[in-house]
UniProtKB/Swiss-Prot annotation:
The gene is CIMAP2. It comes from the Eukaryota. InterPro entries: CIMAP2 (IPR033557). This is Ciliary microtubule-associated protein 2. Coiled coil: none annotated. PANTHER family: LYMPHOCYTE EXPANSION MOLECULE (PTHR34914:SF1). Sperm.
Length: 418
C-alpha cells in the first residue's frame, strides 16, 4: 500500500510539470515539492547563487550556468577585428577633415576683428566706465530676506500643548471635566421651563420652631426708611462752594505748599562738614615721592624704579665670576665625565623634578635597566698613575659585582678533570 502511494505521489509530481527532477519517492508531510524550494512562496525575494536555492533556479541552472571564461566570443565587444578595422579605415579621413576645418576662417571673423579695433580706439581718459564697489554689490545676486529672517511661519499651529492655560484647570486636576459637562448639557438640554443651572432643588420650607406671636415682620415702609441714604441731593455734584477751585477731578488745580523759611547751613557748620574735613590739613605724604602715586606710571622703570630689596626677574646683581684653574681631562676630552647631562646619558636616570627640568619622555618599556659601573663617573677624570692608592681602588671597582657569585658552569657530558 505504501509503495502504491509513493508511486502515485511520484506520478503526481511529474504531472505538475516542474522543471526539476525529483530523485526520491514519497511525499514528506504530504507535500510534493522540494525541501528547500522557496521560489513559489517568495518569488521576488529569492536569493540567487546560494547553496540551497541555486540548483532550483531555472535561470542560473540553464541560462547562465554555461557562461564562463572561454565560452563566449569577442565579436560582440568593441575589440573585435571588424570594429578595429572600421576605426582604422576612417582615421585618415577624420584627420583630413579636421585640418581643413582649422584652415577655414571663422564665419564672424570680420565682426570680431572690428569689435577688437573699436575697443583699442576707445581706450583713453573718459572713454570707459568703471563700476565702483556699490554698483558691483547691486549687481550681485542677493536675497530680499534679512539677517534674522528664517523663512519659517512663526505660528504654524499648535505645537503639542493642548492643555488649557493657567487658571482654566477643572476639578480634581482634570481640565476637561468642565468641557465634558458643557458638552453633555448641550446634548441633553432641558426644556425652556426647566432649570438651566446645575444648582440643586430648593429644600421644602420647614418651621423655625418659634411660637405664634413671638416674632414680627418689618413692613416695606420700615425697610425703606432704614436704608442708608446719602445727604447729597441729585443736583449736588460737588460738596462745598462752586466758586472755589476744584480739589480733585480732571479740572482740579495743583495745591501749593505753604511758604516757609528755609534753613541754610552756617559757615561753621559747612566748614565742619564731612566733605570739608580734610581742607587745610597738612598732608603726611611726601611732596616729591620716589615712586609716583598714579598706577599708570608704575610700568616705566625710569619713573618707577625698583627697590633693591624687591625680588624677581632681573632684580639682583649678578655675581662676579672668578677665574679658577681647570684641570683639563686626559685623552683630549672636552667634556667632564660627571654632570647632570652625563648622568642622564650614561646611567639612564631622568629626574623630572626641579627647576629647568622637563617631563620624562622615555617609555618604561624602552628604558635601559642594565647595571653599570657608576663609580667610574662619580668624580672628575684624573690621569693614570697620578695616585697609586686611588689606582688600586679603581682597579677593584672595575671588578664586576657578580664575580664569585655565579656558580661555575660544568659540562657533565665531557670527561672529568684529572
Amino acid at each position: 500500500m505504501r509503495e502504491s502511494q509513493d508511486a502515485a505521489g511520484a506520478h503526481g509530481w511529474n504531472r505538475v510539470g516542474s522543471t526539476a527532477t525529483k530523485w526520491f519517492t514519497g511525499a514528506p508531510f504530504g507535500v510534493q515539492s522540494h525541501r528547500f524550494d522557496i521560489s513559489a512562496v517568495y518569488p521576488n525575494w529569492k536569493k540567487f547563487s546560494t547553496f540551497t536555492e541555486a540548483p532550483y533556479s531555472t535561470r542560473y541552472s540553464t541560462q547562465v550556468s554555461h557562461i564562463g571564461p572561454g565560452t563566449y566570443s569577442s565579436k560582440e565587444t568593441c575589440f573585435s577585428k571588424k570594429k578595429l578595422m572600421k576605426e582604422v579605415d576612417t582615421g585618415w579621413a577624420k584627420a583630413q577633415e579636421a585640418t581643413r576645418l582649422t584652415q577655414l576662417p571663422h564665419f564672424q571673423y570680420q565682426a570680431i576683428m572690428k569689435e577688437k579695433r573699436l575697443k583699442e580706439q576707445k581706450l583713453g581718459p573718459g572713454s570707459y566706465n568703471l563700476k565702483d564697489f556699490l554698483e558691483q554689490l547691486r549687481e550681485k545676486p542677493c536675497s530680499t530676506r534679512g539677517l534674522l529672517s528664517s523663512g519659517e511661519v512663526r505660528f504654524r499651529g499648535l505645537t503639542g500643548n493642548y492643555y488649557p492655560g493657567p487658571g482654566n484647570y477643572g476639578e480634581k486636576g482634570n481640565p476637561y471635566t468642565k468641557l465634558e459637562e458643557n458638552a453633555w448639557n448641550r446634548s441633553h438640554s432641558e426644556g425652556l421651563m426647566c432649570r438651566m443651572s446645575n444648582k440643586p432643588h430648593p429644600r421644602p420650607h420647614q418651621g423655625s420652631g418659634l411660637g405664634p406671636g413671638t416674632y414680627f415682620f418689618k413692613s416695606d415702609l420700615e425697610t425703606y426708611v432704614a436704608r442708608s441714604v446719602g445727604t447729597r441731593g441729585p443736583y449736588d455734584t460737588f460738596s462745598g462752594d462752586r466758586s472755589k477751585p476744584l480739589p480733585y477731578g480732571h479740572y482740579s488745580m495743583q495745591k501749593k505748599k505753604p511758604r516757609e523759611l528755609m534753613n541754610f547751613k552756617s559757615f561753621v557748620e559747612e566748614l565742619n562738614s564731612h566733605h570739608n574735613k580734610k581742607h587745610g590739613v597738612f598732608s603726611k605724604l611726601p611732596r616729591n615721592p620716589k615712586t609716583p602715586t598714579e598706577r599708570i606710571y608704575w610700568a616705566n622703570l625710569s619713573q618707577c624704579p625698583r627697590t633693591l630689596a624687591t625680588s624677581g626677574p632681573s632684580f639682583w646683581l649678578p655675581q662676579e665670576k672668578k677665574c679658577k684653574p681647570v684641570n683639563q681631562p686626559p685623552f683630549l676630552l672636552t667634556s667632564k665625565g660627571s654632570g647632570a647631562k652625563a648622568c642622564q646619558m650614561i646611567m639612564g636616570s631622568w629626574n623630572p623634578v626641579g627647576v629647568g627640568r622637563y617631563l620624562n619622555t622615555w617609555l618604561m618599556e624602552t628604558k635601559d635597566r642594565r647595571q653599570r659601573y657608576r663609580s667610574l663617573f662619580l668624580s672628575g677624570s684624573k690621569r693614570y698613575l697620578s695616585d697609586l692608592a686611588r689606582d688600586m681602588l679603581m682597579q677593584e671597582r672595575i671588578t664586576p659585582f657578580t664575580k664569585g657569585k655565579c656558580p661555575p658552569t660544568v659540562d657533565y657530558n665531557s670527561d672529568p678533570t684529572p
